[in-house]
Structures are given as C-alpha cells and as structure tokens.
Amino acid sequence: MNSSQISLRMKHGRVNMQKKPSKCSECGKFFTQRSSLTQHQRIHRGEKPYVCSECGSCFRKQSNLTQHLRIHTGEKPYKCNECEKAFQTKAILVQHLRIHTGEKPYKCNECGKAFCQSPSLIKHQRIHTGEKPYKCTECGKAFSQSICLTRHQRSHSGDKPFKCNECGKAFNQSACLMQHQRIHSGEKPYTCTECGKAFTQNSSLVEHERTHTGEKLYKCSECEKTFRKQAHLSEHYRIHTGEKPYECVGCGKSFRHSSALLRHQRLHAGE
C-alpha cells in the first residue's frame, strides 16, 4: 500500500469518526453532529447562553437570538413575492405562503380540522385532550401553550420588554407592540370584504363584520338583551347593578358611561 492510499484511508477514517452518531445521556436521542448534541443538551440543563442586550431574553441557540433581535430592529428580510409582505424569519414566510396556496398539510385526527402550521395543530389538539402542560410557579395557573405562560408571568413581574422606537411606550407582548406601531405607520392590514373598511387589529375587523351579519354574541344574564361587543354588554350591566364608575371631580356626580361624564363636564366648562 503506497503513501497516497494510506493517507486516503486515514481521511476516510476521520470522516467516519465525524459521522459516528453521538447519544444524549439524558434521553437517548442520537445526533450526527457533536454541535447538535451540545445544543440539545441545553434543553435538559435549562442553559440559555445567548442573551439579548435589548430586553434580557435568553436563548439556547445563536440563530434564535438573531431572529429575536429583529423584533427590536424591525428587520424583515424575507419577502413574499405574492403580496410584498415581509417577515422576520424564513419559517414564517413559508407558513405565510400557504395563505396564497391554500395548503393545510396538518390535519387533526379527532375532528378533521386542518392547519397550515404544525404548531397550530399541536395547540388545537389540546382542546380535545384538555392538556395544559405549562404551569405558573407563582400562582399555579396552567396553560396549553408556553407562550401564554410567558405572557402571564409578566403580569407578576411587570416586565415589558417590547419597546416602541417611535414613542418609547413599552409592552409585555410583541403582538401588542406590533399593533401599537400601526398607530405610527398608519397600516391597516385587516379589510372588510363587505364594505372595504380597514382596521389595525383583526379583533376590530371581527367586531365590525357583525354590523353586516347582525350577529350578537354577548347576552345579558339579567334581561336576555344581546350585544355585538363585550364592552357594550359590560356597560349595559351597570343598568342592573347601579354601578356608576365615572365621577366628576368638579361636583362629585357619577355616571355609568364615560361619554355621559364628558357631556356633563361641558356644562361646567360653559359656566
């Protein structure tokens, strides 16, 4: 055997050694790359070495931190060729493209409902199982999604890590920040198919659509009267309870509705 053949065998042996699967001592899972095993083991240790300098959020992977930083910078490098909408990660773009294609590859075995995202199916299945695996250590409240637990925990800590670059207002959820930023940008991505009116929030569109359908979901337990909005039902309840939470600082008179207080205050202003 000549020297070149020996060298080739040695290289081949090193490649085989590199490809030899590494096993996690905690759960037995195998990985072809040592770096993948190292990242995986952080799940068991709870180790999150990559820290966001903006809000202090911690991550197991550098790539996850890089994606997270786009929340603060507003960077959206992945653009949809169909509608020009841009996204912070490639995975979110792929999921978004299914809106255009109508593809829903993830189907629930219980009820047949289909989803364009695997996490959406997993979350949905907990409706059938009633599973709530994420529990708050402060108050014991349990949640079906980890993100819901994270948001809830901020109610205990008062943490508001998502800050508006325009006005400095802070929020405990990234979704709330995104909705708020539309005040500055004027963006209204949710459009009514009936009349074309546009809204900054999907919930506002849903409420508006009830003006066309006549649907009234919120029913008074006292008199059976129905309302399109929860806020309108809450105001109506005050007729039965006698509650008048809006008080005039000028004369002490109280009102059920903020609008009634404003009208009253104009009387003082005209004195």
Swiss-Prot record:
Domain of life according to the entry: Eukaryota
Gene3D superfamilies for this protein: Classic Zinc Finger
PROSITE patterns: ZINC_FINGER_C2H2_1, ZINC_FINGER_C2H2_2
Zn finger limits (C2H2-type): 22-44, 50-72, 78-100, 106-128, 134-156, 162-184, 190-212, 218-240, 246-268
GO cellular component, as recorded: nucleolus; nucleus
Entry's induction text: Up-regulated by Golgi stress-inducing agent nigericin.
Family, as annotated: Belongs to the krueppel C2H2-type zinc-finger protein family.
The protein, known as: Zinc finger protein 501
